[in-house]
Amino acid sequence: MKHQLKLGVRTWLHLNRIMYTVGRRLSGHMEHYDLTLAQFGVLAHLQAAPHISQQMLADRLFVTKGNMVGLLNRLEDRGLVERRPDPEDGRTHMVSLTEQGAALAARVVPEHEELVAACMAVIAPEEQRTLHQLLHTLDRALGPT
């Protein structure tokens, strides 16, 4: 007799597969700009919060401090972001987009949103709202990352 996975496990596997598939599509698009998805995440977060600490950015992107340093080094080398010591706490670095980084973010963020929307378009808007509510409930129940 074949083992039947529990519904929760099957649902989790579907979520993983969807995230992988959509992630690959988004990564392919970001290659046109010579960006990884992680680098895009930095630009998008800095567009929304123009001047935040390096640690807060790492927390929001779910990456380690070491990974964040590498991401920022590469983006800084390309002239897309800049880091400055926090005037109130010299141990902390504040990160912001450069003019060039802001211009790139202004192009790629809307394109990213359109690609994600196109992936989701197979689901009716009301079903998308329901899915959003269900995932929000699960996220809250699981607690902080």
PLM region descriptions:
Residues 34, 50-51, 62, 124:
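Central "turn" residue of the DNA-binding helix-turn-helix
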